[in-house]
Design a protein with these regions (language model features):
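Serine-dependent protease modules
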Residues: 3-183
């Protein structure tokens, strides 16, 4: 008969009572991460009316207590209307500015609500092998506030034909809808 192939005895440590070092980071940062809804005017052939229809979703990070949100340009590209999703509620926003070359956009929440702002990190302190925590809204509202974890795989990556320079590479799961979210 085959012998047991699972770890046992003194080599096995229990995780009972152990706390994740990621949980504190997530608890602090998650309220600063919002969903971003890109809506465009679309003609409805049945009703004969023009309607705002969601054409893309992504994520963003609140960077000031005045409601400024940083996201990716490709998340808001072509939008006639942009809203952010915070704590289950859509908030009206305006596009403050964007840069197609760096794929960045800044939004401002137009409603009088308090949104906590994230404390930005220093990219110069990031090293290959450091943990990477991604917080975002993969696939939109249904999966809002999703967390994935990986490591920083490389720094200063450049893609041939890309206008974005000095990218950070991670192996953390990033899905459609995470664009613009917290890393």
């Amino acid at each position: 008969p085959a012998e047991s192939v699972y770890a046992q005895g003194e080599y096995v440590q229990t995780l009972e009572g152990a706390k994740s070092p990621f949980a504190d980071v997530v608890q602090t940062v998650m309220p600063c991460v919002v969903g971003v809804s890109n809506r465009a005017n679309t003609f409805n052939m049945i009703s004969g009316q023009t309607e705002l229809i969601e054409q893309a979703t992504g994520s963003g990070v609140v960077v000031t207590t005045q409601g400024h949100v940083v996201t990716n340009y490709h998340v808001i590209e072509g939008a006639n209307d942009v809203q952010v999703l915070s704590q289950g509620r859509y908030l009206k926003t305006e596009i403050v500015g964007y840069d197609e070359l760096t794929d960045l956009a800044v939004l401002r929440v137009m409603e009088d609500v308090h949104l906590p702002a994230v404390k930005m990190g220093d990219i110069a302190q990031v090293r290959v092998g450091d943990w990477a925590i991604v917080i975002g809204n993969p696939l939109g509202k249904q999966f809002a506030d999703t967390v994935t974890v990986g490591v920083v795989s490389a720094l200063n990556r450049e893609l041939e034909g890309s206008s974005i320079v000095k990218m950070l590479q991670t192996d953390a799961a990033i899905n459609s809808g995470n664009s613009g979210g917290g890393l």
